[in-house]
Swiss-Prot record:
Residues 1-36, 181-235, 346-391 are annotated as: Disordered. This is SWR1-complex protein 4. Belongs to the SWC4 family. GO terms for molecular function: transcription corepressor activity. Residues 1-11, 184-226, 372-391 have a biased composition (Basic and acidic residues). The lineage of its organism: Eukaryota, Fungi, Dikarya, Ascomycota, Saccharomycotina. One of its GO terms (biological process) is chromatin remodeling. Pfam families: DMAP1 (PF05499), SANT_DAMP1_like (PF16282).
Length: 504
């Protein structure tokens, strides 16, 4: 599209001055930003349009000036300087001067180093011959000088027993040298001559050893490799000797518990410590196959523990089952909706009557007199035979009523087949169908046990007495099977425990 300058060139018109209003294009006015913040597009705009006038009180959109990260905090406090200051550790004896960074102002070199207080040393009193004899520290294999050497190493290395055992270089010849140190100082010239003679003798011995055969060399090497009596000390020997000396000193607090002495009465279990180390060595010397076998045994033991707890629970349930009273009647008839409805109706009837129901078929004490049924002749023409007949009929009726009103015994009821029921279920049913049944797994075992005895799975003649006996036999069989299962579990566990005990 042609501009105004192009049109003026075509028409040969002069150009406008720069201050002319026609050349000045109007500036676009900036629209005010919406109150809600940035204008939303797409799905957000549609969602806000659905809201209508219910605009949120707080803007959901993010302003452009907000950032995802927190602003840098404006600390108003002044920065604390760090000074490179020399210092001297009072725990050192060589007077070495080091430097370190210290927060704060300048520190003088005379200030105490804060970590020097942590340099604590263990000190023990010097043993003399009187102390050694008074405390009764003389034991076979230990001397006074060797005990002093041990206490010196303990105080120097702060009871770090691996370091003490590594630095232990005591030899039996040192006792003689320490005991005769004073005499050697007086007779210095003689000792020097003797030492020179010893050196010459040792050189001759070395030359002789070099000329020996290989077999003699091996023997000599073995002898040299064997440590002397003083160097054959183990860590347990050193610990035992140290704690015996300390416990003997602690029995005299007036002399050996001054400041600077750390005396503690400790009884060192030497045998237990040796066994513990041997056990750890055996653990570390295990092969991967042995480790896998131990893990498998641990899993088996955990399974046995779980099975033992489960068996205890089952045993408690079985004991409850054995101690529980046996039900006299079956509840199978009340397991259907029809039976429950019938039970509720009977209970409602009993509550309405307000008295106990009488047994069906029973006759009250006031039995009807059958004598009234016999017609009495009022005629005067009755003969004597008719009168006798009426008397006999009356006697028979009274005897029948007395027999009916009489309460029969259990034997008589069983003989005559008389039974009493609180409520008879409606409809016709087979008595054998009312026999209680168990779970399928238990029922099959009960049937198999009955067949072994020679009893069929269902009674052939299901009378009331036979059905009751059959139910009692089934219940006894179920209890017997549960006890047998529990006994088998106990036997297997006893067998496993005996096997584990034999392995140990």
């Amino acid at each position: 599209m042609a501009s105004s300058s192009d049109v003026r060139d075509v028409l040969d018109l002069p150009d406008l001055e720069p201050n002319d209003k026609l050349t000045q294009q109007p500036k676009r006015q900036k629209l005010a930003a919406p109150v809600g913040g940035k204008r939303m597009d797409g799905m957000q705009r549609e969602l806000f349009a659905l809201m209508g006038e219910n605009t949120p009180s707080v803007s959901v959109t993010k302003d452009s000036h907000t950032s995802l990260f927190k602003d840098k905090p404006q600390w108003q406090a002044k920065l604390t300087p760090w000074m490179w200051t020399p210092f001297q550790n009072q725990a050192r004896e060589d007077g070495l001067i080091l430097s370190h960074w210290v927060r704060g102002g300048e520190l003088t070199q005379g200030d105490q180093y804060p970590f020097a207080a942590l340099n604590t040393q263990i000190s023990f009193p010097e043993l003399t011959q009187e102390d050694y004899d008074g405390l009764k520290l003389a034991t076979p294999g230990w001397t006074l000088e060797e005990t002093r050497y041990l206490m010196h190493l303990c105080s120097e290395f702060d009871l770090r027993w691996p370091v003490i055992h590594d630095r232990w270089e005591w030899q039996t010849d040192q006792d003689v040298t320490m005991a005769t140190g004073e005499t050697k100082g007086a007779e210095g010239t003689e000792s020097k001559v003797k030492e020179e003679d010893k050196d010459v003798e040792m050189a001759d011995v070395k030359e002789e050893k070099e000329n020996k055969d290989e077999s003699n060399k091996e023997k000599s090497e073995k002898k040299e490799s064997a440590p002397p009596d003083g160097t054959a000390r183990t860590v347990e020997d050193l610990k035992e000797r140290f704690y015996n000396v300390v416990s003997a000193m602690s029995k005299h607090p007036e002399k050996y518990t001054a400041e600077g002495y750390n005396m503690t009465t400790v009884k060192f279990p030497r045998d237990m410590e040796i066994k513990r180390k041997q056990y750890l060595e055996r653990l570390l010397a295990r092969s991967p196959a042995e480790i896998a076998e131990e893990e498998a045994l641990i899993l088996k033991s955990r399974k046995l523990e779980l099975s033992a707890t489960k068996m205890l629970q089952e045993r408690q349930e079985l004991l409850k089952l054995l101690d529980a009273p046996q039900p006299t009647s079956s509840v199978a008839q009340f397991q259907t909706s029809q039976g429950l409805a019938h039970l509720t109706s009977t209970l409602n009837d009993k509550s309405k009557k307000g008295g106990k129901p009488t047994k069906e078929g029973s006759v009250g004490p006031q039995a009807p007199d059958r004598g009234g049924s016999v017609e009495k002749t009022t005629k005067k023409e009755d003969t004597k035979e008719a009168k006798k007949a009426t008397k006999e009929d009356k006697k028979a009726a009274t005897t029948i009523a007395a027999a009916i009103s009489k309460k029969l015994t259990t034997k008589e009821e069983a003989a005559y087949g008389i039974s009493y029921h609180d409520k008879l279920t409606p409809g016709v049913y087979l008595r054998s169908s009312k026999v209680t049944t168990f779970k399928p797994t238990i029922q099959t075992k009960i049937v198999a046990a009955l067949q072994d005895i020679g009893i069929p799975p269902k009674p052939v003649m299901p009378t009331a007495k036979v059905c009751a006996k059959f139910e009692s036999i089934q219940h006894s069989m179920s209890v017997l099977l549960e006890t047998k299962r529990a006994a088998d579990k106990l036997e297997t566990e006893i067998r496993l425990l005996r096997g584990q005990k034999g392995q140990l």
